[in-house]
A protein has these predicted regions:
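C-terminal motif of bacterial Sec signal peptides marking the signal peptidase cleavage site
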Residues: 16-18
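Surface-exposed loop and turn segments in beta-propeller and other repeat-based domains
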Residues: 33-49, 90-99, 134-140, 177-202, ...
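Beta-strand-rich domains and repeat architectures in extracellular enzymes and scaffolds
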Residues: 45-77, 274-278
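Repeated scaffold domains used in trafficking and secretory/extracellular systems
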Residues: 52-59, 98-109, 140-153, 204-207, ...
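Short coil/turn segments that connect the beta-strands within blades of beta-propeller domains
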Residues: 62-64, 109-110, 151-153, 212-214, ...
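Beta-propeller blade signature
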Residues: 79-83, 168-173, 288-300, 338-341
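Conserved blade-ending motifs and adjacent loop-strand segments that build the rim/top face
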Residues: 245-253, 297-318
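Loop/turn-rich, solvent-exposed surfaces of beta-rich toroidal or solenoidal domains
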Residues: 257-294
Length: 344
């Protein structure tokens, strides 16, 4: 890598409420200031008909892309389905009344996971219809998005609705046990934050699982920090992208007007982690085009793609070398570009 690694030190102690008690392990915090490949990308604009919301929900199952529809445009179905490549319209899938009871939909490999107050339902494409194939009862259905680790275990992030100060939790459906893993990057101080909820909101983060189930990545919204764990919850890597324009604070300010929103979302493949980085100053009304940061599962930065349009959701097909994006500001367009040559 051409950038500079500056070594800090993160003491990872699993002793907080709701977290599994483990031996203290010293993991260095590694700062990265550049990418081996830093590329300006011009994306193809593919018109979508019928027009969809396609703002936050872009789901790909095999060679089918599902984009969320608005209730005004279609009161019966949740998704419009298109064939890849080319975005040929196939039809509508997913009963709106069935999906309306859910709080969140997560993407799995050839599966969708619908979280609701009674648990979680697993959906797959059967022919050209989206069908529920199994259900999982949960202790508390108000979980954030869950991601499949293996046949029995699921990972979900620790947000302000959950107890404890762990990075994430592992839920085991075989015995309905929940185990907390990792700790927040900062210690809660009531002199800074009015309560734990405000602290956890400032350090809001998401999780993704490597498709083979061997790794978990945690990425933070208000700091360009990411952590990689093994599938038992042991921290393997603690990294932070440290560059200016705008800079990223190591510790998040309790003042929302000082916040910079960095990692919006992520997509995980067996080879790379793709982080959608907005770098948006929250006190500003302007929106810059985001960039996508590619990191391998050892924590090393690989590439940065500077996009020429604003997107809020994306999907990566490494086998076919394609990147797809959708935007809240352009609901009738899907953006695409080839990534294979850019990652060589």
């Amino acid at each position: 890598m051409k950038g500079l690694w500056i070594y800090g030190c993160t003491l990872v102690a699993f002793f907080l409420i709701g977290c599994t008690r483990q031996k203290i392990v010293e993991i260095p915090l590694r700062y990265h200031s550049s990418f081996p490949k830093d590329v300006d990308v011009k994306m193809e604009e593919i018109p979508v008909s019928p027009k969809t919301e396609s703002t936050w929900e872009m789901r790909v199952l095999g060679d089918r892309m599902l984009l969320a529809t608005s209730e005004m445009d279609n009161s019966d179905y949740k998704y419009a389905m298109f064939e890849l490549p080319g975005m040929k319209f196939i039809g509508y899938v997913g009963s709106r009344s069935e999906f309306a009871r859910g709080t969140m939909v997560a993407q799995g490999k050839d599966e969708l996971y619908l979280m609701h107050k009674d648990g979680m339902d697993v959906y797959r494409l059967v022919g050209e219809t989206l069908q529920k194939v199994s259900s999982l009862g949960l202790i508390d259905g108000d979980y954030p998005a869950m991601h499949k680790l293996d046949v029995n275990r699921w990972v979900y992030g620790n947000d302000h609705r959950s107890d404890g100060l762990c990075d994430f939790y592992i839920y085991d459906s075989s015995d309905e046990s929940v185990r907390g893993c990792g700790v927040y990057p900062n210690v809660y101080d009531r002199r800074q934050f009015k309560d734990v909820k405000a602290f956890k909101s400032a350090y809001a983060h998401g999780t993704r699982v490597k498709p083979d189930g061997s790794r978990v990545v945690v990425f933070y919204n208000a700091t360009r920090r990411y952590r990689i764990y093994d599938n038992e919850g042991a921290l393997l890597y603690d990294g932070m992208m440290d560059y200016s324009n705008p800079s990223s604070a190591l510790l998040v300010s309790p003042d929302r007007n000082q916040l910079v929103w960095h990692y919006e979302s992520a997509f995980a493949t067996d080879k790379y982690i793709y982080l959608l980085c907005m770098d948006r100053v929250m006190s500003s009304n302007s929106y810059n085009n985001p960039n996508v940061q590619v990191i391998d599962w050892a924590g090393k930065p690989i590439a940065r793609f500077r996009l020429d349009a604003y997107i809020t959701a994306f999907h990566v097909d490494e086998d076919k070398g394609e990147f797809y994006g959708a935007s809240a500001t352009n609901p009738g367009i899907v953006f695409a570009f080839g990534i294979a040559s850019l990652l060589k």
